[in-house]
């Protein structure tokens, strides 16, 4: 009998598998990104149904399988159900998960990345912070975690933009979303982050397509 292991993290994606099962991509603090198979999670009344949705944070009890891990139970700490109540917030939130799914690696500890996803989703729900600012701060910090960053903006930038850039790279996670920028500086900041991101991860993100169409 396989020994159960407990991983702490967040569901990045959830897809149907066969009639009643789900295939999850879970970002964990202990093992980075893992594939988890949730047998019977789509059956009505299954205790795994709600716990295997995108955005769910918790402790995942699993056993090792042939192609990933098999889910036994989940102790949920946060569902982030409020994100789905607003379409724009839902798109930005989905993008955060998509980007993490693209960047995260297997068999590498990812505690800071898990915490970054959590705090960034919280920031999206903060009506005082523009979603575009949250997105760009998140992207730059993700680039830092992956080693794909520059100490200063790649384009010529204002002093305010440079200061914000260095702050995002150096600030403790808990202090990451404690500032705002003027529209002009945010546009400048966004342009520079977008350039770096395209070079490092030239991927296509479905959530951004939906966001553009709104």
Which residues fall in each region the model found?
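Non-catalytic alpha-helical scaffolds and adjoining flexible linkers that form interface surfaces
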Residues: 1-22, 27-214
